[in-house]
């Protein structure tokens, strides 16, 4: 308005800003910060914003400055020319860079041009575009910066598809937290309860069902969980990701039903040291896996626990070593009435409509689904 009598009749404006500290010569500090653009696409229109949090991965500040410049050009170009397709804005951010130079772990679109943009889906698209390996949502369902959330916090993780959240999921986390909070280095009030979903469980064919993804986020948030979507298939890579931000204890609660997966040597093909390398990277420091029991379906079936779970004969001594050294810890359920539950039966029942499945999920979850 102040320039109305001086400027041409039909200008549009934009402002670009980046606040990222350069890497110090003396210290290998984490280089991360905020980058954003505020733009008009039509003269006199209300502005819209695209803001993102970035991590610079180059080893010196000259390379980082170059990468930040390329990122800025990509953002400005995408915001002006691809604003009708925000997925294209995301996909174009790494043009000329690649994922080895920069990571974008949060992006937020706002303003009149982006009224219909679902920011949670755009952040999921960051993973699909190889701009990050994980995105995090707080219990309010809002996308948050992982480094700020996990910084110096103990973290308890449960991995699953959560389609839907079941009573077993809830009891696993509650029982695991009860034991995890007893560790000397854990302040119960600081624990981050993290439900992790891998991208593999969200993708059907080549596509992600956006409505299904949002429903899972909302159901987990209703139970008070922080949610992380990642493409970390192997547990030790998940642990390494969390170790970027915290040196406090990390706990992973796992059903004994998943031991076939954990102790499957094919799962570790491609690692030079195989399963030994994987477990060495999973348990190097202050990390524990809490093993939750299960009861096979059918009346009178024996409870399967960490003490009697079967693994391949050649791996029994490895299992014994991990148990003896308190790397694998047995969890005592708080509610053993659902130990026989099979999530496949819950899903099948849910598809048929109301029924017995409602007893196998928390009441607030059942009410949301109904």
Where do the language-model regions lie?
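Nucleotidyltransferase catalytic core that binds NTPs
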Residues: 1-370
């Amino acid at each position: 308005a102040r320039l109305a009598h001086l400027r041409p009749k039909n200008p549009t404006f934009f402002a670009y800003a980046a606040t990222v500290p350069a890497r110090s010569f003396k210290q290998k500090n984490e280089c991360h910060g905020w980058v954003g653009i505020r733009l008009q696409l039509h003269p006199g229109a209300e502005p819209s914003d695209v803001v993102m949090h970035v991590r610079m991965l180059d080893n010196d500040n000259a390379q980082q400055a170059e990468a930040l410049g390329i990122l800025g050009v990509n953002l400005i170009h995408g915001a002006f020319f691809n604003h009708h397709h925000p997925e294209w804005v995301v996909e174009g951010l790494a043009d000329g860079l690649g994922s080895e130079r920069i990571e974008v772990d949060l992006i937020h679109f706002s303003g009149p041009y982006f009224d219909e943009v679902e920011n949670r889906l755009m952040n999921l698209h960051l993973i699909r575009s190889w701009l990050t390996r994980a995105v995090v949502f707080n219990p309010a369902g809002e996308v948050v910066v992982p480094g700020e959330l996990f910084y110096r916090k103990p973290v308890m993780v449960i991995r699953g598809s959560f389609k839907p959240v079941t009573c077993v999921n809830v009891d696993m986390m509650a029982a695991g937290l009860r034991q995890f909070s007893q560790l000397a280095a854990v302040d119960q009030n600081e624990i981050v309860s993290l439900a992790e979903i891998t991208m593999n469980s969200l993708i059907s064919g080549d596509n992600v069902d956006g409505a299904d993804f949002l429903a899972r986020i909302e159901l987990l948030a209703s139970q008070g969980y922080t949610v992380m979507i990642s493409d970390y298939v192997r547990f030790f890579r998940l642990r390494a990701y969390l170790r970027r931000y915290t040196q406090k204890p990390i706990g992973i609660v796992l059903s004994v039903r998943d031991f076939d997966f954990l102790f499957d040597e094919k799962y570790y093909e491609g690692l030079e040291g195989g399963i030994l390398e994987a477990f060495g990277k999973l348990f190097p420091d202050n990390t524990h896996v809490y093993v939750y029991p299960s009861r096979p379906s059918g009346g009178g079936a024996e409870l399967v626990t960490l003490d009697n779970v079967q693994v391949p004969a050649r791996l029994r001594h490895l299992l014994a070593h991990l148990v003896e050294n308190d790397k694998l810890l047995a969890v005592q359920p708080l509610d053993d009435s659902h130990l026989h539950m099979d999530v496949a039966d819950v899903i099948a029942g849910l598809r048929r409509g109301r029924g017995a499945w409602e007893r196998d999920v928390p009441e607030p979850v059942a009410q949301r689904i109904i």
